[in-house]
């Protein structure tokens, strides 16, 4: 009796008299709840990637104390913080999955944690409070930490539930649509990501951190509302209650987990490299000529090419590349992932080569590069033979015994510099022994090329893993298995954070510098790709769907 009472308490299933459906409808078409999930995902991903896009730039160029004084992090410190945050966001899926599958169900879990998510965005928006309010509450770094913790809990907790919720809407009659719907689900992710990646860097530069972090929060509130609107259209798979733990951690459940975990360890290496698009690649873009194709890019805006390419690649791969390739070779999910790994190696090799070009140009001038993206007065005690500065207009500037940038260039000024002449043109100013020279900094086009390759890898790895993880999970473990896949993102980012931590010197900078940093990760990915060939050969797949009989999931 006691066990039955506990089960009734913890199950929290909507009463059967409610309008909620508890099994997929037999239809060959798209389930009615899918548009609400896809719309929710587009707005939620706008909020997450909009915030994530500017995080490194905020920490290294905009983070202040409560009194308004600079409290910037070094590039290495910012990379570590960034990857620890992403690792946390992809750790909480395990907790969210257990809550959803055992106690609350996916719908209630998503709705509740979405509110936590919104609270996190609010904390980030409060970074721009007046100094008196910051001194009385938390300083900007404190609000940042509070916001990132809440966002990690909220976004992480809902991740496995949302993707598993997509699969729950399908039965055997329309299972042929699952692959395409997961593709369009991923399309929605990148639709939101594309616009936020363009917008939030502009908001940060022109309106400050409050607006840059606040607008994504508004979109998260919209995402929550859209999801709530679809409540009567969804299939609500009932939570299992205390039975869940016996089913999950019994022989058949553990067998499914241990079968998939080795695969996810390899996928973790992909995410280690991929997620550096928001950290190391942003820092690399700061060292490049950002004039490309008639556009002056902001360093954190270059990432926008990734979701734009995803929007192009998803239909291209689904309707052109996969059908053509299937005439030559059987494209199993694991083979797609293997090809994606190989492309990831190529993309990081391109980034490493571009970094080598940057180092070659720096060595040509034997220079100290002074950061030009600082706020307030900057006292510099240094002698440099070369200097780079970002240009915001098209005219050349020539000054005697002083160097100044116009106020529309973030208000930066350098005064009393001991130099003969300076020229600012095409984003570069270089002086050497009193003479003016033109530097040939590598174009940001190199990084865009790397994005073209790694985005193709993302389509092959990430979308495939979403579909593969859902279909390979026993039906009572859909959210949990999806969370283990997402945990691979966490492990990959922990690996990146650990590399930055263990190579950090006393001043907070990495000893693994320049192209060596990129070549290190390239070699790690080569090793993972070679070893993954054995997984492709040995793994034996099996599908599970929600309208399978219960006995099928016990095998």
What are these regions (language model features)?
Residues 83-100, 304-317:
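Central cavity-lining transmembrane alpha-helices of secondary-active solute carriers
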Residues 2-39, 172-179, 183, 188, ...:
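Intracellular loop-helix junctions on the cytosolic face of multi-pass helical membrane proteins
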Residues 157-172, 460-473:
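Intracellular juxtamembrane helix-capping segments at the cytosolic ends
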Residues 135-158, 365-366, 441-460:
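Hydrophobic core of transmembrane alpha-helices in multi-pass small-molecule transporters
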Residues 93-113:
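Conserved MFS/SLC helix-loop-helix module at the cytosolic interface between two early adjacent transmembrane helices
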Residues 53-77, 279-299:
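Short amphipathic helix-loop junctions that connect adjacent transmembrane helices
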Residues 53, 94-98, 126, 191-206, ...:
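A gly/Pro-rich, aromatic-decorated transmembrane alpha-helix motif that marks the paired
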């Amino acid at each position: 009796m006691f066990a039955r009472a506990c089960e009734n308490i913890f199950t929290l299933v909507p009463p059967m008299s409610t309008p909620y459906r508890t099994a997929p409808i037999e239809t060959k078409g798209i389930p009615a709840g899918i548009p609400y999930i896809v719309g929710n995902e587009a707005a939620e991903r706008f909020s997450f990637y909009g915030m994530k896009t500017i995080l490194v730039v905020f920490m290294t160029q905009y983070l202040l104390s409560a009194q308004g004084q600079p409290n910037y992090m070094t590039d290495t410190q910012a990379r570590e913080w960034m990857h620890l945050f992403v690792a946390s966001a992809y750790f909480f899926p395990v907790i969210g999955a257990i809550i959803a599958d055992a106690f609350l169900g996916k719908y209630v879990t998503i709705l509740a944690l979405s509110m936590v998510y919104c609270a996190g965005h609010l904390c980030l928006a409060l970074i721009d409070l007046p100094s008196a309010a910051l001194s009385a509450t938390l300083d900007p770094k404190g609000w940042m930490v509070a916001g990132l913790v809440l966002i990690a809990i909220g976004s992480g907790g809902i991740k496995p539930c949302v993707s598993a919720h997509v699969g729950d809407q399908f039965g055997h009659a329309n299972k042929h649509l699952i692959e395409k719907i997961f593709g369009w689900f991923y399309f929605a992710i990148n639709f939101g990501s594309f616009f936020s990646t363009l917008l939030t860097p502009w908001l940060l530069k022109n309106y400050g951190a409050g607006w840059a972090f606040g607008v994504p929060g508004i979109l998260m509130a919209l995402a929550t509302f859209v999801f709530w609107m679809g409540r009567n259209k969804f299939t609500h798979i009932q939570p299992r209650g205390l039975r869940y733990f016996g089913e999950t951690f019994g022989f058949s459940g553990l067998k499914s987990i241990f079968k998939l975990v080795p695969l996810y360890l390899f996928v973790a290496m992909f995410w280690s490299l991929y997620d550096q698009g928001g950290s190391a690649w942003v820092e690399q873009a700061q060292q490049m000529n950002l004039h490309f194709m008639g556009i002056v890019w902001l360093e954190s805006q270059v990432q926008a090419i990734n979701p734009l390419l995803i929007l192009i690649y998803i239909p291209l791969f689904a309707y052109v590349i996969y059908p053509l390739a299937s005439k030559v070779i059987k494209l199993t999910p694991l083979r797609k992932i293997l090809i994606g790994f190989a492309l990831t190696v190529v993309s990081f090799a391109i980034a490493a080569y571009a970094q080598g070009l940057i180092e070659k140009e720096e060595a040509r001038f034997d220079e100290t590069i002074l950061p030009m993206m600082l706020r307030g007065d900057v006292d510099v005690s240094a002698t440099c033979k070369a200097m780079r500065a970002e240009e915001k207009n098209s005219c050349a500037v020539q000054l005697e015994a002083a160097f100044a940038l116009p106020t529309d260039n973030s208000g930066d000024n350098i005064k009393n510099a001991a130099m003969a002449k300076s020229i600012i043109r095409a984003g570069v100013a270089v002086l050497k022994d009193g003479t003016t020279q033109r530097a040939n900094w590598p174009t940001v086009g190199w990084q865009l090329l790397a994005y073209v390759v790694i985005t193709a890898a993302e389509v092959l790895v990430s979308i495939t893993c979403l579909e593969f993880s859902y279909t390979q999970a026993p039906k009572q473990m859909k959210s949990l298995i999806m969370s283990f896949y997402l945990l691979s993102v966490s492990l990959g980012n922990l690996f990146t954070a650990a590399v930055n931590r263990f190579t950090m010197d006393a001043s907070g900078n990495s000893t693994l510098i320049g192209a060596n940093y990129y070549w290190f990760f390239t070699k790690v990915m080569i090793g993972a790709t070679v070893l993954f060939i054995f997984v492709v050969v040995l793994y034996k797949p099996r599908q599970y769907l929600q309208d399978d009989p219960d006995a099928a999931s016990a095998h």
